[in-house]
Regions:
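Basic helix-turn-helix/winged-helix DNA-binding cores
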Residues: 1-103
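Intrinsically disordered, low-complexity, charge-dense segments enriched in Lys/Arg
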Residues: 101, 105-182
Length: 182
């Protein structure tokens, strides 16, 4: 890949940051608002998105709790942020298993903020913006190891999706010419 292509791919992850638990709306959001908020956080990443029907299915399957008076809470938003990322590499059954594990050890706020920290730690590394990745604590439990593995897998999938999107854009802009220039 050319240097310009690599720069455009890396741009997907530059300055990426998720809102922390306390920064998520404290008032309930309707389904469309919930989907819009989650998708806005991952706008630069093709494939990391939710639809209203997906969210409704997660509720029906019991992966997240039912909305209260048709409004989704901060805890449900946090769960949906994680689902948006992990659904690209895990089955719903495995996502639900990880949710159950984290609930045994951490509050929703702790688990979500740790997820944010890990994603923000791994993305720059996978996208080539940083040469190291912060190590897990020696006493990290199984749930943290599984989360790290999920995030590294998802970050690699996010990288590939960005790379293919850049390649398709370049081919659309310069059909046939790129091959001649190579």
């Amino acid at each position: 890949m050319k240097e310009e292509s690599n720069r455009r791919i890396a741009a997907c992850a530059v300055d990426f940051a998720l809102p922390r638990y306390e920064e998520l709306p404290s008032v309930g959001l309707y389904l469309d608002q919930t989907v819009q908020l989650v998708n806005s956080c991952f706008r630069g990443f093709p494939g990391v998105e939710l639809t209203p029907s997906m969210v409704s299915n997660y509720v029906k399957k019991g992966v997240i709790s039912h909305p209260v008076k048709k409004k989704y809470t901060r805890e449900q938003l946090a769960s949906l942020m994680y689902i948006a990322v992990s659904k690209t590499v895990l089955s719903m059954e495995n996502i639900d298993t990880l949710f159950k594990m984290q609930r045994q050890h951490f509050s929703a706020a702790q688990a979500y903020d740790y997820f944010c920290d890990e994603l923000e730690n791994c993305l720059p590394y996978v996208f080539g913006l940083r040469h190291t990745i912060r190590d897990l604590a020696e006493d990290a439990g199984e749930e943290k190891l599984l989360l790290r593995s999920t995030i590294i897998s998802a970050a690699n999938k996010m990288y590939l999706d960005c790379a293919f999107a850049v390649m398709r854009q370049e081919e659309a802009l310069w059909p046939g010419i790129l091959a001649d220039l190579a």
